[in-house]
Amino acid sequence: MEPLIALVGVTLALRIAGAAGVRRLRSWPVALRGGLATMFVLTGLAHFIGLRAELISMVPPALPNPGLLVTITGLLELAGAVGLLLPPTAPWAAGGLTALLVGLFPANVYAALNGITTSPEDALVPRTLMQLVFLAATVAVLASSVRGRRPRWRSAVAPASAQG
């Protein structure tokens, strides 16, 4: 639940700061990037401190070297968080984090179905709903970045009202 609270709380705080006059935070995509970055810093750090043992136990047994996998995914989450804060890399970070969320979801399913985690929000349905919110946020950042970079072509032909 903490990642969801971080995502929503920081996104709203940044958007409120934008409404209060901080120009760089006036758009929802920028505020959402900040909320996602905060969330992924928290979850990325959890791969190294606090929840490391639990995260290692969530890795399905078919995958090799769970400790290394948890380390790699933690580093990817931290790198993605930094990437979200830099406008040139934000689309790449959002795309990578989207793929990471999809790729890591089977570990959440495995943990929920095998009783590895005991908190209610880690049960399959709540966890799936949270994962969908996280995915929606990363896809929204990616979509806004792609939309903002699309060239705006002007017609080479003058409009009919200008001809004559």
Residue ranges: model-predicted function:
Residues 1-164:
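Membrane-interface extramembranous regions
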